[in-house]
Amino acid sequence: MFLSPGEGPATEGGGLGPGEEAPKKKHRRNRTTFTTYQLHQLERAFEASHYPDVYSREELAAKVHLPEVRVQVWFQNRRAKWRRQERLESGSGAVAAPRLPEAPALPFARPPAMSLPLEPWLGPGPPAVPGLPRLLGPGPGLQASFGPHAFAPTFADGFALEEASLRLLAKEHAQAMDRAWPPA
């Protein structure tokens, strides 16, 4: 008796017929990591409705560049978290876990151009060294004609970088430069 691969005492009776393949290992999804922007938009939508309809989910999914099914699962998980929090707060006599206060939303108002002094040779105005031009081109008159966000850096998908993060980075850079190059 000749046995073909996959046949034998362990597989007899439960063996695969001709043309059938062994079941493939189930594919496991990697955890989705959401950006700050995506989480902000998803939370805003959750505040508006805990049970958005399919059209709302599709619209939101397109806005945050996620598949609709990821948005749907996020809402399922968020509702479960919300129910847990409600159960803890209305409590069964047990001490509820303290909720952390939500961080206040930062205003997106743009400060006046060049409000942070970075380096003397980077801003508009007269050159620090006579005879050498400034490195940042247009002065305040030209910047004003384009509007406050005309030169804001953006991600590839078009979302402007968070202004608060940029301010913090600029401040840290200025402080580091002050330490490295003490004033003369």
From Swiss-Prot:
It comes from Pan troglodytes (Chimpanzee). May be involved in modulating the expression of photoreceptor specific genes. Binds to the Ret-1 and Bat-1 element within the rhodopsin promoter. It comes from the Eukaryota. Residues 27-86 bind DNA. Its main location: nucleus. The Homeobox transactivates the Ret-1 element in the presence of CRX and NRL. InterPro entries: HD (IPR001356), Homeobox_CS (IPR017970), Homeodomain-like_sf (IPR009057), RAX/RAX2 (IPR043562). It is found in: Nucleus. Disulfide bonds: none annotated. One of its GO terms (cellular component) is nucleus. Pfam families: Homeodomain. This is Retina and anterior neural fold homeobox protein 2. One of its GO terms (molecular function) is DNA-binding transcription activator activity, RNA polymerase II-specific. Residues 1-33 are annotated as: Disordered. One of its GO terms (biological process) is visual perception. Residues 1-10 have a biased composition (Low complexity). Interacts with CRX. SMART domains: HOX (SM00389). PROSITE patterns: HOMEOBOX_1, HOMEOBOX_2. The keyword Nucleus applies.
